[in-house]
Amino acid sequence: MVNHQTVGDRATHLSPEDLAALREILHEQRLFRQDQLRQIAAAPRAEELLGRRSAAQAEVHVKLAASARMVLADVEAALQRMADGSYGTCHLCRRAIDRERLTIVPQARYCARCQQVREAGR
């Protein structure tokens, strides 16, 4: 189901075309992260066969995989929000996330203001 979100001004309004383009970007990101995870999983086996896997390399692989899984989960969640009609709404203040922000970070859960507040609290 594609939602036509009318929030008010053009900065926050997501047209059906905007949603379709963002959905395509999210699908591409999902495929990229899935492929990245496959490559990360395959790399240690190849290194072990060659007997060249160091502890530092293993740690890098673990951190890369964790990061890829986290981004993949964010992408999957964004696609689910698109499906259920809540995409583009900030999880904290419930206001619309600016179209420009979603274009840059299509999996964004928070508007720029709430994201800054969250990051300042860390």
Protein language model regions, located:
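Hydrophobic alpha-helical segments of small multi-pass membrane proteins
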Residues: 95-97, 110
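Short functional micro-motifs and their immediate structural scaffolds
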Residues: 97-98, 116-119
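Short Cys/His-rich "knuckle" micro-motifs
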Residues: 100-105, 121-122
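Cysteine-rich micro-motifs
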Residues: 107-116
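Cys/His-enriched microdomains
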Residues: 88-91, 109
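Short, cysteine/histidine-rich loop/knuckle motifs that typically chelate Zn2+
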Residues: 92-93, 113
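Interaction interfaces in information-processing and related assembly proteins
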Residues: 1-84, 122
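Residue-level signal for mature regions of secreted extracellular proteins and peptides
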Residues: 83-86, 104-107
